[in-house]
């Protein structure tokens, strides 16, 4: 949607564009859209780039960018805008006020040490998974992952675990929010096939993804249930495929399933802690 140059960037309240029956601050929503426009593929952008990615006019985008710069969230070198480290404080506010990452991190550290593999936890945000905890091994991984990293849920093991436990209407919205595009030759891009896989994931209680997000990356994930029985997060163990030159023969799923009992036990420890806090 294109907003004309006369649109106000102030803090007016409007129900237009907002959820029906709620108070909606349109200018705040636009400012957050500007922040979200920056990502791994677009770390630094011109004014025109930001306007294009947000659907705002150049005049409106300029006001938001310079406001964010005055507040310390954006820097401008005369040509390109980029986020500053101060943006991390927004995410830290969530992490520091939410008990889930605090419960998960020590469990992941133990699990990673036991398996000598990288372990992660994530939650669902729309059509994406967002990492809320991560423990790395010393192995070199082709995908750079840290707390706050977002990936399309449909192509990840944790994402599929989380999608699989959504109510039907919520799943419909999540799948409609993002097109299924091939990230690797192995990525499932048929909605019918994905829905069938999600049903299978829900039934068996775990998900294995083999090189669908990135070639060479495999992972297995399980859900973490809250005190009310709903899925609060997902845990996974990720591994990289052996280099072809090593001549290693392996059965990927069998290897992943060897780790499943410890992964499931870790998830149950977190679930038990959540139940105890009820």
Outline where the language-model segments fall.
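N-terminal helix-turn-helix
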Residues: 1-97, 101-102, 268-276
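Short, solvent-exposed recognition segments
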Residues: 2-7, 140-215
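Short, structured helix-loop boundary elements
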Residues: 24-28, 84, 97, 101, ...
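Amphipathic alpha-helical effector-binding/dimerization core
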Residues: 82-178
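Juxtadomain coupling helices with adjacent low-complexity linkers
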Residues: 204, 232-278
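Short hydrophobic beta-strand micro-motif common in sensory/regulatory domains
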Residues: 218-222
